[in-house]
Amino acid sequence: MMAKQVPSVSVSYARNGNSTTSNELGMRAMQERAYEKRGEQYLLIKSPPASGKSRALMFIALDKLHNQGLRQAIVVVPEKSIGASFNDEPLSDFGFWADWSVLPKWNLCNSPGTDGGKVKSVTAFLESGDRVLVCTH
């Protein structure tokens, strides 16, 4: 049985300022390359810290929710502090066709509580009609 390869986007920078320039949708070069792969079921994004991985995921998740038929998106981050990167973001102010929005009750990185309570919250989210949940793994 052959192992299935997971598409990935790796980025290295020449330090010439191009990585901070945005396109007409408000995406930097790495985010644009990741967005080009948005139809993949699995996507691994390897990029330096503060390069825009969180925002790239917002672009991709919004496309999956609005254009690819996904009902809900669960963003899973390795630590609570990274979850703050997924608060509401007015992406349309920069040219994208939608804004990123997470109801406060569904950003479990910002809410106190035990893991048992968070498991109940995930279950409640899955049973709800809401679109996005952010939590730690």
Report the location of each language-model feature.
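Conserved two-lobed SF2 helicase motor
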Residues: 126-137
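Conserved Walker A/P-loop ATP-binding site and its immediately adjacent core
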Residues: 54-58, 64-65, 69-95, 136-137
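Conserved helix-turn-beta segment of the N-terminal RecA-like "Helicase ATP-binding" lobe
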Residues: 81-116
